[in-house]
């Protein structure tokens, strides 16, 4: 039997959806076969089920979507949003909560195979973005564990041979993938942005990726980066520092990870947004870069 669509809704739901849309997401509430589906951002379907018991009375299944490129803080905000929707729309109070989720992402003792020698401050980069099913009894550590399992499965499809030939570690590739995820909106550009990063690392040039500065200073996408922030020395200021950032700046999907391991074979050193504010111009010439930069000033 389908739920009654005419049931009165709280005023918090439209307001919450407005917040989600404000983050550049497409957020919807849809009645699935059972439970609630909160969608957005084009994340891949994982088919993962977190904390779903095989015994006892059936529990209503809820669904949470983490889009590619979300940071762990954005994922925690998504957990909070889903909790509100579950309570307001279904009268369910999930065990998941944003504070416990962030705390769980601070624990780095059980990193996936291939990353055992890495000692990051948190699980940024390892929280695989996908769709996850859960019940009201699912805990935050269980959800994070499921994300780590999904990451390990996805990472098994990444061929590291070329990256290793360039003396890059798996963690280096993950960091590059997180940058690609933040910079690219057009899928065919992933390997091109990866090539620019590889080429700049080879030449000893700063990467100059402003998304790293946003991450380091926790600047929202709706807010401009200040000139003082661009000029300040900071571990995540890739305009000032040569090399990769200390950690990933987002949680990338499989396509970005594969591109980071296998860049295009081009000599590009620069990329800048086109006037459409989505795709990029790519060039090996500083002169051309400066010319193209003037065209994309509004982005």
PLM regions: where:
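Conserved catalytic or metal-liganding residues and their short signature motifs at active sites
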Residues: 1-205, 252-255, 259-267, 275-299
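Short glycine/proline-rich, acidic loop/turn segments that cap or connect secondary-structure elements
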Residues: 225-234, 258-268
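Short, glycine/charged-rich beta-strand-loop motifs at protein surfaces that mediate ligand recognition
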Residues: 241-248
